[in-house]
Design a protein with these regions (language model features):
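Accessory RNA-recognition modules of RNA-modification enzymes
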Residues: 1-205
Length: 205
């Protein structure tokens, strides 16, 4: 970065702040998992796509996801394997808030009554909320449970609570986001009556 500032911008920073750090594991609140039923393996896989390929990695966990979501990967694969639409469910969008975890299922075909019953049972058993996406991003809707709390992330230091939809952009690392906001506010040193808004990171802070 310093080289680029000097070479491109012809400037040299007066002060370089120390980098901020977060937990190395279990930090990612957002993810997109691929789903594929593999006949040769005789099962359905839920995971990330392999590098430079269209194959879905055979995963039993993901250490950068919250432990609860990581632990659900094999259970999701097993549940989806029993659905009639298992070959028409290509991806799962993960969105974790401070008070609810949402999984958005991309469903290319409508689920049957049996599929819906299986999804409800899974959501109830594991304390998550399913949303369904039959078409484009504007087609998503909450499926079960309908009385789940809204997705939000909070900045307790500033008494800020931000609601968001599962497909809206938020920082994937909420803990590090709080640290960044704290540092920014400290550097800006707002005075009484002044307001600060962050218009860069999606919904802002």
């Amino acid at each position: 970065l310093e080289d680029n500032l000097a070479r491109i911008g012809k400037v040299k920073p007066e002060t370089i702040l120390p980098p901020i750090h977060g937990l190395p594991w279990g930090y990612r609140q957002r993810a997109r998992l691929s789903v594929r039923h593999v006949l040769k393996k005789g099962k359905t896989l839920v995971g990330f796509r392999e590098k430079r390929g269209s194959y879905v990695a055979d995963m039993s966990r993901c250490e950068i996801l919250p432990p609860k979501i990581s632990g659900l990967i094999p259970l999701l694969a097993q549940m989806i394997d029993g659905l009639s639409i298992r070959e028409h469910l290509p991806q799962i969008e993960v969105a974790c808030g401070d008070n609810v975890d949402v999984l958005v299922l991309r469903v290319m075909e409508p689920p049957t009554a049996g599929d819906e019953a299986a999804l409800r049972a899974f959501a109830d058993a594991h304390g998550i909320q399913f949303w369904l996406q039959p078409k484009g991003l504007d087609s998503i809707y909450p499926f079960h449970p309908l009385d789940a709390p809204a997705l939000t992330y909070t900045l307790p230091e500033f008494a800020v609570e931000m609601p968001f939809a599962p497909t809206e952009f938020t920082q994937v690392n909420s803990a590090l986001n709080r640290v960044m906001v704290h540092r920014a506010i400290r550097l800006l040193d707002p005075q009484p009556g002044e307001r600060i808004a962050d218009f860069f990171c999606g919904l802002g802070n």
